[in-house]
Amino acid sequence: MIKNIGVDQIEVDRIAKVVDRGDGFARKVLTDREFAQYQDLTHKRKIEYLGGRFAIKEAFSKAWGTGIGQAVSFEDVETLRTESGAPVTTSRIFTGRIFSSIAHDDHEIVAVVVLEEPAGWRRAIGKLSHLLSGRKK
């Protein structure tokens, strides 16, 4: 069952400016493993990668319902690139499945995150509650 959906977009020019200033923003936003992937990229790909990861984290926090802050930090969400280049997003605060997508052109980067609740335990609790509610005391 879908818990929620989050979307974020950011201008490429904004990310390009922070990439041009050095690694400070990247170190703040990216996990250690994301930063390791980031370091191996060309300048143009660094902009796309950092912007995409920032947008994914923002989209996740919106789907979580809080935004980035006390409830969700940049470290709580990690999106790594598979060998095929597809993003795989995980979180240390959410145990369900996370579906993510990043799109970019020369001007904007957009990310979408869908959170899917772990179905097994919810379904089991629902069935158990239904069975117990029909019992005589």
From Swiss-Prot:
Known cofactor(s): Mg(2+)
Q: Where in the cell is it found?
A: Cytoplasm
The protein's predominant localisation is: cytoplasm
Q: Which residues does the annotation say bind Mg(2+)?
A: D8, E58
| InterPro entries recorded | 4-PPantetheinyl_Trfase_dom, 4-PPantetheinyl_Trfase_dom_sf, ACPS, Ppantetheine-prot_Trfase_dom
Any one GO molecular function term: magnesium ion binding
Judging by the UniProt lineage, the source's domain of life is Bacteria
Q: Which reaction does it catalyse?
A: apo-[ACP] + CoA = holo-[ACP] + adenosine 3',5'-bisphosphate + H(+)
* A Pfam family matched in the record: ACPS
Query: Which GO BP terms apply?
Result: fatty acid biosynthetic process
**Keywords in alphabetical order:** Cytoplasm, Fatty acid biosynthesis, Fatty acid metabolism, Lipid biosynthesis, Lipid metabolism, Magnesium, Metal-binding, Transferase
Enzyme Commission numbers on file = 2.7.8.7
Role according to the record: Transfers the 4'-phosphopantetheine moiety from coenzyme A to a Ser of acyl-carrier-protein.
Family membership, please give it: Belongs to the P-Pant transferase superfamily. AcpS family.
HAMAP family assigned to the protein according to its UniProt record, in alphabetical order: AcpS (MF_00101)
Q: What is this protein called?
A: Holo-[acyl-carrier-protein] synthase
The gene designation is acpS
